Structure formats: C-alpha cells, structure tokens
Amino acid sequence: MSKDVIEYSKLFAKLVNTNDDTKLDDTIASFLYYMFPRELFIRAISLLESSDMFIYILDRVHNKEGNEHTSLIDVLVDEFYKGSSNSLLEYRLIVKDTNDGAPPILVDIAHWFCSCEEFCKYFHEALEKTDEKEELHDVLINEVDDHLQFSDDRFAQLDPHSLSKQWYFKFDKVCCSHLLAFSILLRSSINVLKFFTVNSNKVFVIAIDNIDEWLNLHINIVE
C-alpha cells in the first residue's frame, strides 16, 4: 500500500487515553468521527458502550476455575493480537437487536459480513451499481499482490495469514456500525480490547462448553 494510505487499525489502537486507560482519547475519537460517513463511528462507539455486544467462544480448553473471564480474554488476545493460538478458535460475534422480537445480529469481521439491514442495503446497492462486465470481487475487494505495497492495516482485511497477497474489503462501499464496532475491538490493540471487555465491562465474553448449547446459539440466530 502507498505510504499515504491511512492505517485504520493503528488509529483504533490509540483510542484509549495513554495517560488514563479508563478513558477514551477525545482527540483520536474526534478525528475518526470525520473519517466515516453516516455517523458510523459514533454509532459504533455507542454499540461498544451499550452492553449489547457479545463474543461467544466454544470453550474446550480454557474453562478454568476461579478466573474464567480473564482466561477468555487471554484467548482473544492470543487469537487476534498475538497470533499464538495453537488451534482454530471457534467464536461468534453477536449483537442484541434492539427491536422487540428480532433475532440476534451475526457479525463476521473475518469475511466482512453482517446480518443487519444496513449491511444488506449497501451490499445490494453496490451490486446494483456493478456493470455486467465487472466481477463482484473486483468491485468490493482490493487485491494487493506487490509486496512493496503491503500494509500493516488489519481493518477490513480478509485472510490476513496469506504471505503472497493481501485482500481488503472496500468498506467505503459496504459497512455498518456492527462491523466497525467489532473491528475497533478486535483489530486495534490489546488495550482497546481490555478497555471494553474488562475495564468498562460493556462487551461480554461468554464461554460455551456444551456443544448442544453451541448449536442452539446458531438456531436462535437463524430464527
């Protein structure tokens, strides 16, 4: 990537005040506000502070007595920030829909997908604007195969483990507050993750160690 390209994940990482880790940095927050349309950033921060965001983990190993919550945070750190997870972590990112009777919203930052109406709306708009001769892949995904153009940015990145190419979803075409909120949480820094999950305790990390309960979680999402 060009040196002029903004690395959003590094900006997200600076959201927590360096002098007081119990507060957000107002300067960085104000800067990010103007970088996203439709007040996306404000809505994402509101989501992170709403107590409506959940990370469910199929917990086969880290169900330790006495310190379960801390160990689950360590699992997320290993998976998203240290890359030291020994096995593929099975997790689901869920947002409680504020509309009565509506199913939970499923968010997948790894594949840049959300089941909310906002995501579907802008995805279909991008689809309608696509020329018949254009591939949808080319319209929505930025592919980088020149190592000199590689970026350290992790925001909207697809398949980050590839060594030969980089792929980024064009979030300026399709994005929602749910994807942005979970990206801020999981594609920024350990400090930001712990700020919302431990310090403020607004995002809940929940272990599921029963496969039947894990399957029921998916059924509830579909319903």
From Swiss-Prot:
Plays a role in a RAD51/RAD54-dependent homologous recombination repair (HRR) pathway to repair MMS-induced lesions during S-phase. Required for error-free repair of spontaneous and induced DNA lesions to protect the genome from mutation. This is Suppressor of hydroxyurea sensitivity protein 2. GO terms for cellular component: nucleus; Shu complex; site of double-strand break. Belongs to the SHU2 family. Keywords: DNA damage, DNA recombination, DNA repair, Nucleus. GO terms for biological process: DNA recombinase assembly; error-free postreplication DNA repair; maintenance of rDNA; positive regulation of single-strand break repair via homologous recombination; recombinational repair. Component of the SHU complex composed of at least CSM2, PSY3, SHU1 and SHU2. It is found in: Nucleus. The keyword Nucleus applies. Its main location: nucleus.
